Regions:
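Alpha/beta-hydrolase fold catalytic core
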Residues: 1-18, 39-43, 79-80, 163, ...
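Active-site loop/oxyanion-hole signature of alpha/beta-hydrolase fold enzymes
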Residues: 4-6, 31-39, 43-86, 241
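Catalytic histidine-centered segment of alpha/beta-hydrolase-like enzymes
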Residues: 227-240
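Active-site glycine-rich loops that stabilize anionic/oxyanionic intermediates
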Residues: 22-25, 88
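Short beta-strand/loop motif that positions the catalytic acidic residue
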Residues: 189, 195-197, 201
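Catalytic histidine neighborhood in serine/cysteine hydrolases
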Residues: 206, 210-229
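Conserved alpha/beta-hydrolase catalytic His-Asp/Glu region
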Residues: 125-188
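Flexible "cap/lid" loop of the alpha/beta hydrolase fold
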Residues: 92-136
């Protein structure tokens, strides 16, 4: 299991932030965030889920399994409460975890997330076949219209082999597609929650995001303009500022 700490040693006296990446990705997507949050006095746990990046083993097949894995990680590290910042699929994990383990979470940040993430069947078929078209479709639907990526979209550089598409991305997409408890889970969330959306995101349109926010008690919303699905890259500094203000309350 690989966990990046942002270059700072883990200290049980500090509050801990878990950075949860999205489908097919790795901890690398949080490279503009790890040291920033660490400098604010938090432990950083930027994970590669099993089967992703530097973590061995098969990919976990359901959102519930990933939540249970997070609970096990907390037990190993002796963490009693966690702050979860989840992007895309990572938001589903945050929603599920907060609803099932309310005593283990202090705050939740959902980035480009929704309580349900149905996946286009063509996208799943391409991914299961290890076809690069799966990555191209993700990039088109998530980031079309965004001008943030000079020199190429970084997602393609992370998911860059047919094995990764077939054994990692496809499993993650099916996990998102098969998660059906989102609406009920939202109603069980009690911790302070920040929802961050990009106005150009075609994977999580604003109307879907607004509906989700209305269903979470003690929640607030931040909309980032001229931004697609990959907020953590596209508008990292604006996002970090919003998260810092939220966690300071």
């Amino acid at each position: 299991m690989f966990v990046s700490t942002g270059g700072i040693d883990f200290d049980k006296k500090k509050p801990s932030i878990l950075l949860m990446h999205g489908s097919g990705l790795t901890h690398i997507v949080w490279s503009l965030h790890e040291q920033f949050y660490a400098s604010q006095g938090f432990n950083i746990l930027s994970v590669d889920l099993p089967g992703h990046g530097n973590s061995e083993g098969p990919s976990l097949e359901s959102i519930e399994q990933i939540s249970n894995w997070v609970k096990s990680l907390m037990n190993v590290l002796g963490i009693k409460k966690i702050i979860i910042i989840g992007h895309s699929q990572g938001s589903l994990v945050g929603i599920d975890f907060a609803s099932r383990y309310p005593d283990l979470i202090s705050s939740l940040v959902l980035v480009a997330g929704s309580y349900k993430m149905p996946v286009n069947q063509d996208l799943i078929n391409y991914a299961e076949a290890g076809d690069e078209k799966a990555v191209l479709l993700m990039m088109k639907w998530g980031y079309e219209g965004s001008k943030a990526f000079i020199g190429g979209n970084p997602v393609k550089k992370i998911i860059n082999s047919s094995r990764e598409i077939r054994e990692v991305l496809a499993v993650d997409l099916n996990a998102c597609n098969n998660y059906k408890d989102g609406k009920e889970s939202l109603e069980k969330i009690n911790c302070p929650t920040l929802c961050i959306f990009g106005d150009l995101d075609k994977m999580v349109p604003l109307e879907v995001g607004n509906k989700m926010v209305s269903m979470i008690k003690n929640s607030e919303k931040k909309i980032i303009n001229n931004c697609g699905h990959m907020i953590i890259f596209e508008k990292a500094f604006e996002m970090r500022k919003s998260v810092k203000e939220f966690l300071s309350k």
